[in-house]
């Protein structure tokens, strides 16, 4: 059964092109605009012990990861103010900074009080000020919060730095001894915790829209089944146990339904189940492989991957009935669709030519243009931040599966720190506050 499941995925993910793509759209390989220089000055600390986290570094990294801002390195800073009255704007103008943030951390009754301020260097005006308090263990949370507030103030886009990520690791100890672990971490890979361990594969973890539940595929008892697990309690509920393939779960926007792939009737097709009534509905009916469903925010539109045209491409359909409409036309392979929050951009795995050149790309759904975001060759499983500014994906580096982050504008691309072993199957959480 495992071999059958993997075989079907290989057929879909690595099928060679049979005919040339219809070139309706255009391909763009990079952008040329520039990130805004910003300085996040090391926060002042009034306590005696060394703090376990560097607030300024976390905030700088968050803003950098968005692709909107280019942090100025600490070693280049002319002065190190920790409060508003100490800011010398000519220092920051000399460095070309557009914005500067200062902050101060004070111990207060077993907690930490953090005050911060953000300035526009050109106008020398304060654009944001605030304070937040918490414990030592909450320093990363507070740093992500400040980054969220700053990003939203400057861009009008809600920050997504306080979100979480799911991923799966596989550690092979011998030929028949591999440990699979489902992990949850901060979006940047920090503070990973284990949600599930198994000697059998774990696939396709997905956060529910409420952020409190997850769905995934487990090969316990040597066959694929879909489970829903409550994060806080660990309580699990088996959702499917059909013969053949049970895979690729995807939540509806209201969390009341799951779409997934079943082959119980002989061919991999997409189904939707109502989690309350357990009513199962078949959505696709084609002789091809249909897989990787993803709901639009209306709860009725379903994007999916199919090779019904002879090669994997992305289609959309309505779960209540009707035909499928092809969405992608650039390249000989497009798969694993995800939508940005505003549904203007489709994120996918794209191959322009060849047999192993799989990259993360985005398609403007209004214009049809496609832009490649990555320069690696074996990318898979893209997942999009809830504000649409960043993508995390799995790829291979030096023979090992790793996770990477790329900004949607293509300016930033970097590896994420994760546990040992093969790392795969990332999934971004919704907003959690």
From Swiss-Prot:
What GO cellular component term, any one, is given? periplasmic space
Q: Does the keyword Cell cycle apply?
A: yes
Top-level taxon of origin: Bacteria
Record bears the keyword Transmembrane: no
List S-S links within the chain. Answer: none
Q: Where is the signal peptide?
A: 1-21
- Purpose: Part of the Tol-Pal system, which plays a role in outer membrane invagination during cell division and is important for maintaining outer membrane integrity.
- Recorded family membership: Belongs to the TolB family.
Q: What is the protein name given in its UniProt record?
A: Tol-Pal system protein TolB
Q: Please give the organism.
A: Pseudomonas syringae pv. tomato (strain ATCC BAA-871 / DC3000)
Source gene? tolB
